[in-house]
């Protein structure tokens, strides 16, 4: 899972602008699901849950079917936002959750010889 925070410039309304662009077809490779609370990409696996928290877009990227592929949606989304809306973005913060460690292997006990 990757967490992403996009800090918008004052009075930018980046969340509304992005939702409008996705719904109108200006951003053709992205679409909204679940009443606009989830973003999906045409080719990248997974989805991004997002919400507006007063000047900061809080996003969480997940790929439940293909673990470790979050980076594809991340690069597509950041690239598109920075390319199309550079005047609305002030900063981007990315936080990566490390995968849980693998459990140690259990050793089998040998059968006793008789």
Region annotations inferred by a language model:
Residues 34-60:
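A short, structured beta-strand/loop element
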Residues 15-16, 39-43, 101-107:
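Short, solvent-exposed polar/charged micro-motifs at secondary-structure junctions
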Residues 10-12, 64-67:
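Helix N-cap motif at beta-to-alpha junctions
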Residues 66-95:
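C-terminal structural segments of small proteins and small subunits
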Residues 25-32, 43-44, 85-89:
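Short secondary-structure junctions
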Residues 1-36:
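Negatively charged, low-complexity tracts enriched in Asp/Glu with abundant Ser/Thr
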Residues 89-114:
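Short, highly charged C-terminal tails/helix-capping segments
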Residues 14-16, 50, 69:
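Short acidic, gly/pro-rich beta-turn/loop elements at beta-sheet edges
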């Amino acid at each position: 899972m990757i967490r992403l925070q996009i800090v918008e410039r004052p009075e930018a309304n980046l969340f509304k602008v992005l939702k409008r662009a996705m719904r109108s077809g200006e951003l053709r490779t992205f679409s909204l699901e679940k009443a606009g609370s989830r973003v999906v990409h045409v080719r990248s696996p997974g989805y991004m849950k997002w919400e507006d928290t007063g000047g900061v877009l809080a996003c969480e990227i997940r790929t439940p079917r293909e673990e470790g592929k979050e980076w594809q949606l991340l690069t597509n989304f950041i690239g598109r936002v920075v390319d199309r809306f550079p005047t609305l973005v002030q900063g981007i913060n990315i936080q990566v959750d490390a995968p849980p460690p693998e459990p140690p292997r259990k050793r089998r006990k040998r059968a006793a010889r008789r």
